[in-house]
Amino acid sequence: MAKVYHDTEVSLEALKDKIVTIIGYGSQGRAHALNLRDSGIKVIVAVRPNGESWKRALEEGMTVEKIEDAVQKSDVLMFLIPDTEQPTIYKEKVLPYLRPNQALGFAHGFNIHFSQIVPPPFLDVFMVAPKGPGPLVRDLYVEGKGVPALFAVYQDYTQKCRDIALAYAKGIGATRAGVLETTFKEETETDLFGEQVVLCGGVTALIKAGFETLVEAGYQPEVAYYECLHEMKLIVDLINQGGISFMRKAISDTAKYGDITRGPRIVNEETKKEMRKILNEIQSGQFAKEWILENQVGRPVFNALLKKDEDHLIEKVGKVLREMMPWLKPKK
């Protein structure tokens, strides 16, 4: 089992008298910046001058600088902008101003693991990846709690990088819940696999396939939507709360029997073979190369596939049905 580090085992000492720059002030950036500040760490927010993030950070009492200025003043730099934007920002606004003994931090390992960012050898490089959205990271911190996180050290020039990573995790409240040590390779590959095969790709493909099967068999699209999409949250919430066995205790015996006898016919050995193929594409770097190239040519496949799914019947039906559910606060 992985070693879990808790609040009492970790000190903020490694960040004492250091300046931490948070690059980005979106969902995660704002949460990290505010939590670190409230933990007594000196924080600079680095964003595009006079944009919405700049204005919001100022309104919330943060010290705000242009990225290139903040880099020169800081000891620790945390990248909390989208993965696709990081390499250009790093090359143009960070790399020219780096100095020995600084630390680069990331919340996801993609750009380091797939060499889109290659840091000079005189830096520490670490990762702290909260396992929850930014607003939750902030809200739980304010309540005296925390969101669990992963941490990793990629490059330890000062021989203090591990302490810096753990101190950072403590500063955002993660050690209150517990942090697990991993590697950039493990975090990146498992994160991509989970997104593609289960959490996003797998779930959405399963929902659409079930919906289409019922509609093609003559059932009303509205009923198919309820059975294949809307009720998904009920089951996922139970699994999230207590695991698969806990969920099964909360459903009918009929549902339970159908689950354990029919589920394996849907996700079978052929499905797992395809899962292993996708994992290999991630491990070999094939997916990363494909996604990087897709961005370089303007995302034609990405945009076309998104548009196709946005025009799917399930979206049209869902929009109508969600208007009947005011508690969902339907959004465009």
Swiss-Prot record:
GO molecular function, one term: NADP binding
UniProt-annotated catalytic positions: 108
This protein's UniProt keywords: Amino-acid biosynthesis, Branched-chain amino acid biosynthesis, Magnesium, Metal-binding, NADP, Oxidoreductase
Coiled coil (UniProt feature): none
Gene3D superfamilies (alphabetical): 6.10.240.10, NAD(P)-binding Rossmann-like Domain
Pathway info: Amino-acid biosynthesis; L-isoleucine biosynthesis; L-isoleucine from 2-oxobutanoate: step 2/4; Amino-acid biosynthesis; L-valine biosynthesis; L-valine from pyruvate: step 2/4
Cofactors that this protein relies on: Mg(2+)
Ranges of residues in domain KARI N-terminal Rossmann: 2-182
Residues that hold Mg(2+) 2 according to the record: 191, 227, 231
One Pfam family recorded for the sequence: KARI_C
GO process annotations (BP): isoleucine biosynthetic process; L-valine biosynthetic process
Binding site for NADP(+): 25-28, 48, 53, 83-86, 134
Domain KARI C-terminal knotted residue range list: 183-328
Enzyme Commission number(s): 1.1.1.86
Binding site for substrate: 252
Reactions that this protein is recorded to catalyse: (2R)-2,3-dihydroxy-3-methylbutanoate + NADP(+) = (2S)-2-acetolactate + NADPH + H(+); (2R,3R)-2,3-dihydroxy-3-methylpentanoate + NADP(+) = (S)-2-ethyl-2-hydroxy-3-oxobutanoate + NADPH + H(+)
Binding site for Mg(2+) 1: 191, 195
GO cellular component: cytosol
Family assignment from sequence similarity: Belongs to the ketol-acid reductoisomerase family.
Protein name in UniProt: Ketol-acid reductoisomerase (NADP(+))
